[in-house]
């Protein structure tokens, strides 16, 4: 009965996800018109006391007091809203409909789309070498970034963490200044979205726009015009809808930018910029593995491609110390000379030769390869569809997405540490007769990245919404198994990857238990 209930819960959750899910594409058009307007059951009015991630305190960056609502300047700001509303266009109505579902959700959608657009490995030069994208010259060929899974996981984490800290500061200053919402000052004012009882200064949407734009400009520098366009829409929506006056917006943008600067400074020194390594390092990794008597991994791309970010395991985590990463490292994989390895290789070959329609659907659904928002993005999409049904406040949205994405970044760090520590070959390297059913990633096999990401995500989401734990765990297992069914991973890769993800996810859960939000 328990297994049947778990199966039903999983299927229900998957159907819900598929009903809302739109795939990413190069036209930056991932949108979801079926989401309702944000109308939280609880505004979390005391969230200004929640534990920040990087800020030393919610008031680390000062915010000037607002102008009084009795001043002529404030009256002019009220009149600006009325002027917009008296001449509202269909385009402006569409902007309100789009952004009123919530800023955290919409920026997450936008980021997933940007990740998908830039998830393109560089094409080789005429001499067979591969150029590397450079943040110093992002418009060159190849464009920066190549948003592969580790890069994407880090990007989601930085943006989500910065948004969360920014909204904690916002809630703090709302409480400090207690400026009433415009409709409470002028009862003739229309409000075109659900009314909020929260103070209006500073605007939470403006803070989100301010902090997110600065992070996305760093992470996706060729997309600045589009990113700024979306931020301008978000600011305009709050004014036209009657939710905020101009000074609420201006203060929010200023505060968001200040907070972004602290995260940008951290990003500059977290080690991600040197994670690609160099030719000497790549050769050393192969030599070290061979010295143990094991078969070292090699790139199966033609021409041979440099390994993907072999030093990403050294990137600075938000929740784990380097010692914790090493302590969490999984046990060694089966020796390439062992009977267990031979059995697991044979199992992969059998799946390759006897692919069922059901297995192929599973492989395809969880592939998340080139041109997609990556496995971390897939779990962001799953979380978003479920969070919409929970009627969270904007700040609780930010908190939950931050917990998820911090764990996914740590999953990338821990998984890449294991991959390049063990340098284990792919099944089709050991047996070239194996035909893979999905793309072959350009990095070692052990442990599976999909499995680690999925284990971490399911652990965090199960804590956030315990009633859906069985469904989240079932999805993680299916995502993990899909890599073995696709003939690119051994069973040990998948099973140990899930376990590593669970360990990593629990570090985020431990933080959740003491962050003041529960």
Model-flagged regions — what are they?
Residues 1-2, 25:
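N-terminal hydrophobic targeting signals that begin at the initiator methionine
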